[in-house]
Amino acid sequence: MINKFFSLPLFLLISFSAFADHPKEDVEKWLAKMHHASHMINYDGTFVYGQNNEMTSMQIIHSVGKDGELERLISLDGSGREVIRSGDTVTCILPDQKSVVVDKTRPDSEFPPKFPLKIEQLSKVYDFHFGKDGVVAGQKAIKLMIVPKDEYRYGHTLWVDMKTGLLLKDHLVGKNNEIVEQFMFTQINYPESIDKERLLSKGENKKYTWYNAKDFDSKKDASGNMSWKVESLPPGFVPDIKRHHNMTMTDMPVEHLMFSDGLSSVSIFVEKQMKNSKNLIGGSTMGAVNAYGRNIGNYHVTVVGEVPHVTVKMVGDSVKYIDR
């Protein structure tokens, strides 16, 4: 899938007495079933994705066989955009930009979204509750609510296919129980097999410009001996990724750090300021994604993630460098 690009939630104050409480083992059972279904079964369906009062329809074809895990996402908005995933390689075909981008998949960009299998650490910053069962895309679904204990992360309301375990619907929930992002299958099938031809893109064009994301030698990083650190993180967030690489379409070197609580994550990008560059200063919001930017000396720092604004600002303001 194409990489995606608030105050204390009021719903934390709501009594959960009406919800059916289940042991931790039941929650983990369903998370494991979701994980298995998203990677280990064939499915073919149509879903809608929405944010900022805008909805987009997409078709997904997912196959597991002798060639491993293959997936094709097709935009139904007329743009011709497609995403092909084969193992851990993702190819994005963008006809409107006459380009093809090849990258490695990351857990935070997978569809359906990837959820942790164990909740011991998550339980420190989230509560888990089962709600009333429902029906999504004609399938009976169990309802699972993941509720944050503070203002630094969003919650999730999940509807999971009772038979297969596939995640059929997800509401990303912010303050005042506001839905900041959502997806929902409108039609779903589980075929025994899928013709490989259906997983091949019809939109690739040799005249398109191809971009291959490649990590580069960190010794060549523009920041030299300078090391970056984050002095203040929300509870539960720990280091997840630290790497140096070139920006896919500009080839500019950037240092990338990611912190995660196991469900929510924030990424920090540090790059050398370029002359006449229009860098983000302050905050920006696009649906569930918040970003915050500031300059530190000759460098620009951008923090971005599917987390509330208070989180990216807290992290961004605490980024420091040590000149060794």
Regions found by a protein language model. Give the residues of each.
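Bacterial N-terminal signal peptides that target proteins for export
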Residues: 1-7
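N-terminal leader/targeting segments and the immediate start of mature chains
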Residues: 2, 12, 16-69, 77-79, ...
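Short, hydrophobic/aromatic-rich segments at coil-to-beta transitions
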Residues: 40-44, 66-72, 138-145, 166-169, ...
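Short, surface-exposed coil-to-beta transition loops
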Residues: 55-59, 78, 152-156, 168, ...
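An acidic-aromatic
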Residues: 61-113, 172-184, 190
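Intrinsically disordered, low-complexity linker/loop segments enriched in Gly/Pro
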Residues: 107-156
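Gly/Pro-enriched, hydrophobic low-complexity segments
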Residues: 137-206
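Short, solvent-exposed recognition patches
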Residues: 208-296, 309-310
